[in-house]
Amino acid sequence: MWNMLIVAMCLALLGCLQAQELQGHVSIILLGATGDLAKKYLWQGLFQLYLDEAGRGHSFSFHGAALTAPKQGQELMAKALESLSCPKDMAPSHCAEHKDQFLQLSQYRQLKTAEDYQALNKDIEAQLQHAGLREAGRIFYFSVPPFAYEDIARNINSSCRPGPGAWLRVVLEKPFGHDHFSAQQLATELGTFFQEEEMYRVDHYLGKQAVAQILPFRDQNRKALDGLWNRHHVERVEIIMKETVDAEGRTSFYEEYGVIRDVLQNHLTEVLTLVAMELPHNVSSAEAVLRHKLQVFQALRGLQRGSAVVGQYQSYSEQVRRELQKPDSFHSLTPTFAAVLVHIDNLRWEGVPFILMSGKALDERVGYARILFKNQACCVQSEKHWAAAQSQCLPRQLVFHIGHGDLGSPAVLVSRNLFRPSLPSSWKEMEGPPGLRLFGSPLSDYYAYSPVRERDAHSVLLSHIFHGRKNFFITTENLLASWNFWTPLLESLAHKAPRLYPGGAENGRLLDFEFSSGRLFFSQQQPEQLVPGPGPAPMPSDFQVLRAKYRESPLVSAWSEELISKLANDIEATAVRAVRRFGQFHLALSGGSSPVALFQQLATAHYGFPWAHTHLWLVDERCVPLSDPESNFQGLQAHLLQHVRIPYYNIHPMPVHLQQRLCAEEDQGAQIYAREISALVANSSFDLVLLGMGADGHTASLFPQSPTGLDGEQLVVLTTSPSQPHRRMSLSLPLINRAKKVAVLVMGRMKREITTLVSRVGHEPKKWPISGVLPHSGQLVWYMDYDAFLG
C-alpha cells in the first residue's frame, strides 16, 4: 500500500509539473473516516477538492483514520469511497480517471496511540522524501466527538506537526461545548496545543451558498440597501430552519443538546450576525468580519425565559425510553422545537424583532433568512391595477433561501418593487414552476436568482480551509460570545415543560406563536394540569384566582400569567389612589427574573397608569455599572422604562457607581440614597414595595445572617451576597416595613421548598430575612403562582 501511494504521488507530481509550477504537497488526514459524516459528506468533499486543485500546482495524499483495526478499517473506508461522484458536466472517462487517482492517493490507517501518530508522521516524511516533494501543509479534520479532541490534539502537537515553512490546519466539527463554561473549557484545552490561526471550527451553514452570499450581496448592493437596512424600514427578520425528520436514532445526542444548542446557537445565530452586522469596507477580511460580528453580540439584548417558546413532538420521549433504556415513567423536557425573539439594541436595529426558529417533525423541510420591509404606502388604485415592479402596496421582502422547500434550491429573492439587485456571475436568474407562491407572493413578483452550479456546503468549506480563508469559520472569540448570549436562556428553560405536538401536517396551528413587548407566546392556549394524572387536563380558566392566607397575610395565587395580570392591576389601582390622594405615587421595585413579566405587562397593557406622577425607586442593586447586564436598573430600563412615559427626574437608580468606584464605603452611596428617599418620600414610607423571595429565604439583598439591614436605624445598607456579584446595595428591613403596602411575588417550582419552609417559621429575620417583612401600619400581600404554592 505504501509503495502504491508513492507511485500515485509521483504520477500526481508529474501532472502538477505539466500543469504549472509545483506549489508543494498537502497531506489531509480525516479522523473518523468511517463515520456517518465522513461517508455522507466529507469523502465527497475531499474528492471535489482534489478535482478542483490537483492540476493547479499542489500534490495530495489522503489518510483516512479511525480507531478501528487496519483490515476492518480499510474495508469500511473502501465502502465509503464507492459512492464518490463527479460533477454532472464531467465526461465519464475523465471521471473514472480522476476517481482512480484519488483512490490510489487514499489510504487507511489506525490512529489510536501516540505511537500511531508518530508512525504517521514518519510515513508522511518518508513519502515526501522518496517523491522529492516539498511539504506545503497538513490538514487534520476532526470528524470525531469533542471528548476525543484533547488526546488527538496532544498527539498531533507532539509528533505530527509539519516542518518549518509548512502550515498546519486543524478542522473541528460542532458541538463546541454545551454552554459557555464547557465551551470555554474546550477552547482552553485546544489553545494549549494549537494557535488560533491553525483552528478552523466548521459551521456548515456558512458553506451554504445562500448564506455565503449574504455579505457579498449586501456589499454589491450597498447603494440600494443603505437607506433600507435599518429600523425605519425593516418590519422584522425571520431566520428559519424547519425539518420533517425526527430525532429517532440520534436521541443520545439530542437529549444532551436539544434544538437550541443544535441549531439556534450556531447556524441561525451566524446568519443573524451576517444580516445584522455593520458592513465592513472589505467583506473578504476575516478580521473585519469578526470585529463587526462581535459588535452585534455586544448589542444583543439579554434573553429571558419569556423570549422563547419550546415544543416537543409527541413520540420523542418514547424514542428516548427505547433507545436509551429509560424507565416507562421517564418524560424528557428536551425541546425539539424552539422559537426565540431576539432584539439588537443599537441605532440600526432598535425595536426590530429578529425571529429565530427551528424544529423537527414539522410540515416541511426548508431554511431561509427573510427580511420583511415595512409597507408605508397607501395606494389609491384598486388592487387589480397594482403592478409587481411598481406598486409599493405589495409586500416588499428580501429572502436568502438556503434550500429545500417548494423552491428546492438555494436562491436569492428580491421583491420587484424593492430594487433590481446585482449578483456575481456565479448566480443566474431562475424560473420556477408556474403558479409557485413563496412568502405570500407569486415567484413572478421577485427578481429570483440561483447558483449557476450548486455545491455541497462541506465541499465549499473544504475549499476555504485549503485556501486558508478564515472568514468562513468560527473563531474562539465568536464562539464564546455566542454561548455567552445563549447560556442564560438555556438555563432558564432547563425545567420548562415543552408544548407537545403530533408532528407534520397534524401540527395545525398548535405551534403558531406571536410576539409583543419582548415576549414570545403561543397563539393557542394549551391545557395545563395542576397535578398530572389520568383524565382530561383542566384548563387554566377552571382554576379561579385563589384567595387565602399565608403567614397570616392575604395570599393571591393563580397560574403565572393570570397572577401577573392580577398583580399589575393591583399596582395600577394603588397608583391611581395614591395620585388622587397625594398627587404622586412612590413605587420601589426589585430586580431579578421574576418581575420581568410584570414589567412587560405594565408597559404594554396598562395605558391608564399614572406614569407622569410616579416615582420609581430600586429595592436593591448589584454593585456593577448601571449599564451592566447584571444591573437591576438595566433590567428595569430594558423591560419597562424605555416603553413608558415617565419623567426622567422621577427615576431614582441606586448610586452604586460613584467616583469611578463601585459601592465604596467612603463614597457614602447608601447614605446618599437614604437622604434622597427622606427628601422626596413622605415619612420615608413608600406607597408600594415589590419584593421577591430567594431559595434561601432572602429578600431584597438582605441575606441570612446579614450583619446589616435586618434591624437598626439605617434606611439603606451595603450587603454581601453569597453569589456573584457579591457586593450589593439594599433597602433595609426597617425601611421596607414603613411602606403602606408590600407585595411579595413568588413564582416557579424552584420556590416550592422555601415557600413550604417559610410558611412554618416564625419571626426569624436573621435566619430567614423574608420572615421579617411585616409593615408596621401597612398591608402585606403575597402573590404566588400555583407552581410555587402547590408544586
From Swiss-Prot:
Residues of the active site: H267 (proton acceptor)
Residues at which NADP(+) 2 binds: R370, W617
Carbohydrate attachment residues: N157, N282, N683
Location of Pyrrolidone carboxylic acid modifications: Q20
Protein's recorded name: GDH/6PGL endoplasmic bifunctional protein
Major subcellular location class: endoplasmic reticulum
Record organism: Homo sapiens (Human)
Gene behind the chain: H6PD
Signal sequence range: 1-19
Pathway(s) of this molecule: Carbohydrate degradation; pentose phosphate pathway; D-ribulose 5-phosphate from D-glucose 6-phosphate (oxidative stage): step 1/3; Carbohydrate degradation; pentose phosphate pathway; D-ribulose 5-phosphate from D-glucose 6-phosphate (oxidative stage): step 2/3; Carbohydrate degradation; pentose phosphate pathway; D-ribulose 5-phosphate from D-glucose 6-phosphate (oxidative stage)
Subunit structure: Homodimer.
